[in-house]
């Protein structure tokens, strides 16, 4: 299970990096849309890193555990909203349900502890 926990965390980081770099090909000029696209990628990277640190150090302090739970709930909420918005085009956007599933997995790992 520990391996799967680490894998899910680093997959979130990887998807966040891909999302951030894709922004450069989708948006050719600075815009509000580009900023939101970029910030979503940064959010995924941060959530993945929080989970990677938590997975590496165990349950940790109460504040750190709360931070991981909050980050995972935020990933799940954004994933749900994105799946609702892209419901007709999920086959072209497989990263949307992937991020949601990874958020749920990491939340379960966080709540389970060691």
Q: Language model features by range: what are they?
A:
Residues 1-11:
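N-terminal membrane topogenic signal
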Residues 10-21, 33-56, 69-77:
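Core segments of alpha-helical transmembrane spans in multipass integral membrane proteins
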Residues 26-33, 51-64, 79-85:
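Short juxtamembrane and helix-loop transition motifs at transmembrane-helix boundaries
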Residues 29-38, 89-99:
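Non-cytosolic membrane-interface motifs at loop->transmembrane helix junctions
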Residues 42-47, 98-110:
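Alpha-helical transmembrane segments and their membrane-interface exit regions
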Residues 59-60, 66, 70, 76-96, ...:
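Membrane-helix boundary connector in multi-pass membrane proteins
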């Amino acid at each position: 299970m520990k391996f799967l926990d680490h894998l899910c965390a680093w997959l979130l980081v990887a998807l966040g990096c891909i999302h951030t770099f894709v922004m450069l090909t989708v948006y050719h000029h600075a815009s509000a849309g580009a900023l939101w696209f970029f910030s979503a990628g940064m959010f995924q990277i941060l959530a993945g890193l929080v989970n990677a640190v938590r997975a590496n150090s165990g349950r940790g302090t109460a504040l750190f555990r709360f931070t991981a739970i909050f980050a995972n709930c935020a990933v799940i909420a954004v994933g749900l909203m994105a799946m609702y918005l892209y419901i007709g085009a999920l086959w072209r956007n497989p990263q949307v349900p992937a991020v949601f599933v990874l958020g749920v997995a990491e939340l379960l790992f966080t709540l389970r502890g060691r």
